[in-house]
């Protein structure tokens, strides 16, 4: 059964309370940015054989990975120091990772984060992360504009917490942020308007917002310089009966204007370009990861 990114985040994220490509064609080109892959792209392989899958990712040429699995103070079953060494031995790093910051991680009475969240930040720093990225907002958080603003203040405080460990805190969008309004204001606009850009960075997913009828190129133009990181994702129309109209596809084979979006982002200051593909149109996920890598290298990343 296909597990959607949204379902995965809800079930696992809320539970806590690239060597150059072998072809000489790309060997000497200067990269436009730091390229990596979100390991959710190969989630089933990582669940079955994390070490073997990481070796395949490294063999493709990826130098950076982004995790989507932090449970019981472990990344894919490995302690932070151990996972960092595993990656280093394969020539890779983990500059960012996805862990949901939820209401349960803020103690309103104490005006402080819970120990569970403090451990999350501590473990991220130990693993070598530069960014702790939260990829979800529970619906209860944006029931009213006041409730959203209150939690955006928690976001800002998390930025301060991460800063103490030499990291930054960030938020990653899906499509609901562009589809939903609060007080007749688009949710995504409220998120950006109520977070301090010095404390909370944005990781724009170039594909997710397609299901809200929004194009990433327009968001990059609207908020130049706000996206230190991007999830690089192409989109195609999903098969009839699918949960959403669009699904991700191999880069360059869809309709999301990916190259134009990331080039514009790069010119405005985007540093990290993280490939993520969640649907595969019959291909093996690891083969998609390879084709995505080749597309990014062809585009100069």
Model regions and ranges:
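N-terminal pre-domain/capping segments
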Residues: 2-130, 201, 225, 263, ...
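Active-site acidic/histidine proton-transfer and metal-coordination neighborhood
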Residues: 12-14, 20-24, 106-201, 286
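Acidic/histidine-rich catalytic cores of soluble enzymes
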Residues: 64-65, 162-255
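A short helix->loop->beta-strand "cap" motif at the edges of active sites that frequently abuts
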Residues: 92, 129, 167, 268-271
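H/E-rich (His + Asp/Glu) clusters that bind or coordinate divalent metals
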Residues: 251-254, 259-262, 268, 272-276
